[in-house]
């Protein structure tokens, strides 16, 4: 099956999963939350599907559980693969114009250092992370192969008590890796999709 055919098939499946998750876990909502959602118990990490890994990311950020969030990313020690992230060219240009030097690469240990600082950017409430398909960038493409590679192009929105923390579009590559063949994020291609709110990539560059 070609990547294009896989993409169409995966998008159809995703639409079904999206409907289930939207009604059950709120994963793909994009509206401003009415109030902080800090209540409820912690869910165990689940990496059986890309959607469950996304749900783990969402839940972990809301609960300020940086350990579980980082587990969603590939790690050389645990998975024998490294996570990498890239930045929107406009974010890199803006950062360089401020007289600072952008990092040559962004890997798991960088995200591990950054994430606690990201969570202090707005200390007034819990963070809510929402995803929705970015069809302009291709939606979902299923490349298959030994690692059952899938690329999800998603708009993301991070809110804290009704205030935006970060917004953008991410091309997230999921692959089955490690001893348990878990679906982890191996690559994050960050893009701007709004002029009014900083991207996750800009937050990474600024360290919070």
Q: How would you label these PLM feature ranges?
A:
Residues 20-24:
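C-terminal motif of bacterial Sec signal peptides marking the signal peptidase cleavage site
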Residues 59-62, 74-78, 116-124:
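Sec-exported extracytoplasmic/periplasmic mature domains
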Residues 65-90:
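Short, well-ordered alpha-helical segments enriched in acidic and aromatic residues
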Residues 25-63, 71:
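Short, low-complexity N-terminal intrinsically disordered segments enriched in polar/charged residues
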Residues 26-42, 149-208:
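Short beta-strand edge/turn micro-motifs at domain boundaries
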Residues 92-165:
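Surface-exposed, charged secondary-structure patches
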Residues 31-41, 51-54, 81-100:
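Acidic/histidine-rich, surface-exposed loop or edge segments in extracytoplasmic proteins
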Residues 2-14:
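Bacterial N-terminal signal peptides that target proteins for export
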